[in-house]
């Protein structure tokens, strides 16, 4: 689907369809009022007859409205005007796209950017409309023999902005929205792949393909088990030693800064392409969803796609820490003590607490790049789901300014995160009688103690941890990857690059 932006009055639009809003109870938006006036009250007369109440999710398609140049007008219910929030705005856009496709519209001019969403400007409304529109069209059917392609005739959407001076920000919003939507799609496609296809070698192949794409400014290095042994990444290696699939760490390096002394921002993603739990094996129910234990790595891949697409003036390194946790005669055991790359020793109390063992060595490895900051992304703990449900990603950090930046980006993007504490009491829970620390902290505060563990390997730089166990995928009828937190991290990097126009209200 193509997107563009223009500034013009509704009565002058020669389009297949104009999209305008109606509020509860049967109250026309300002643009709808203009069209109603031109049509000599045709639209308001329909509303008085009860054709449309204006609730979110309702719609009414009008054909050949008197004195209106466009062939059709699509009225979209927007709920109560004063209660319109970000979530409802996205629902309205999704309903609009679905309705246009159902009714066979090939192109349309959208005036829903006139809607007032508190604290949000036209850049935000256009960008979110693009991202939401692309999201509503997503389907993962690559592995189906009968793809049953959905009818999607809509080819072009034009967003109207109030004044010509807002055209530039509108065009930038479309550019950013398309790049982020493509990054989210890439992350979802990678996450949804089954584990018999998507293993660490598959992750590495995707990283190499990204580097080989035109003008990517990315170089990829893949570190295999032999090199890991030489380096001393024993915790990472232990997790994968029960699997027949080799553990591989893919390092994607993007150089976009003109400052040759600029330090890189580093993203490290947990890439457990399947997590059986190992010897501490999981229960059978829902184990198929453990293919999603690599969503952190998929997020890193998606964000690197965004960075490359937008050619951000930053240096960014993305690490996909790929491996598979399986039981077997060579698998690591509860009771093992591992010497990590940092030299710290870890007592294994539970082989299903494996993500932190992979990440701890990856976090030590990236010290060599002298990073500006490091953010790790991981489907790390069920405890985070207990604490925050499926709505917020957990955020923990050793640096308050970095945490605040990420929270700001989460609020701007609508890809929400919530900060959890890391205090001395939680660190005490990961003490071990036999090693420097244990890989679990017992009952209570599991998301926090996992982050405390990781922080012990992130002492030489500013660091943040995003626990996406509750937000990376959906279960049930709508099962599938969400692509989160690609939008959050993309916004964070846009802010760092000074490229975002999302902060100020109109």
UniProtKB/Swiss-Prot annotation:
<dbReference type="InterPro" id="IPR011356">
    <property type="entry name" value="Leucine_aapep/pepB"/>
</dbReference>
<feature type="binding site">
    <location>
        <position position="275"/>
    </location>
    <ligand>
        <name>Mn(2+) 2</name>
    </ligand>
</feature>
<dbReference type="GO" id="GO:0006508">
    <property type="term" value="P:proteolysis"/>
</dbReference>
<comment type="function">
    <text>Presumably involved in the processing and regular turnover of intracellular proteins. Catalyzes the removal of unsubstituted N-terminal amino acids from various peptides.</text>
</comment>
<feature type="binding site">
    <location>
        <position position="354"/>
    </location>
    <ligand>
        <name>Mn(2+) 1</name>
    </ligand>
</feature>
<dbReference type="InterPro" id="IPR008283">
    <property type="entry name" value="Peptidase_M17_N"/>
</dbReference>
<keyword id="KW-0963">Cytoplasm</keyword>
<dbReference type="Pfam" id="PF00883">
    <property type="entry name" value="Peptidase_M17"/>
</dbReference>
<keyword id="KW-0464">Manganese</keyword>
<dbReference type="InterPro" id="IPR043472">
    <property type="entry name" value="Macro_dom-like"/>
</dbReference>
<protein>
    <recommendedName>
        <fullName>Probable cytosol aminopeptidase</fullName>
        <ecNumber>3.4.11.1</ecNumber>
        <ecNumber>3.4.11.10</ecNumber>
    </recommendedName>
</protein>
<feature type="binding site">
    <location>
        <position position="354"/>
    </location>
    <ligand>
        <name>Mn(2+) 2</name>
    </ligand>
</feature>
<feature type="binding site">
    <location>
        <position position="270"/>
    </location>
    <ligand>
        <name>Mn(2+) 2</name>
    </ligand>
</feature>
<feature type="active site">
    <location>
        <position position="282"/>
    </location>
</feature>
<feature type="binding site">
    <location>
        <position position="293"/>
    </location>
    <ligand>
        <name>Mn(2+) 2</name>
    </ligand>
</feature>
<dbReference type="Pfam" id="PF02789">
    <property type="entry name" value="Peptidase_M17_N"/>
</dbReference>
<feature type="binding site">
    <location>
        <position position="352"/>
    </location>
    <ligand>
        <name>Mn(2+) 1</name>
    </ligand>
</feature>
<dbReference type="GO" id="GO:0005737">
    <property type="term" value="C:cytoplasm"/>
</dbReference>
<comment type="similarity">
    <text>Belongs to the peptidase M17 family.</text>
</comment>
<dbReference type="InterPro" id="IPR000819">
    <property type="entry name" value="Peptidase_M17_C"/>
</dbReference>
<dbReference type="InterPro" id="IPR023042">
    <property type="entry name" value="Peptidase_M17_leu_NH2_pept"/>
</dbReference>
<keyword id="KW-0031">Aminopeptidase</keyword>
<feature type="active site">
    <location>
        <position position="356"/>
    </location>
</feature>
<feature type="binding site">
    <location>
        <position position="275"/>
    </location>
    <ligand>
        <name>Mn(2+) 1</name>
    </ligand>
</feature>
<keyword id="KW-0645">Protease</keyword>
<keyword id="KW-0378">Hydrolase</keyword>
<dbReference type="GO" id="GO:0070006">
    <property type="term" value="F:metalloaminopeptidase activity"/>
</dbReference>
<dbReference type="GO" id="GO:0030145">
    <property type="term" value="F:manganese ion binding"/>
</dbReference>
<keyword id="KW-0479">Metal-binding</keyword>
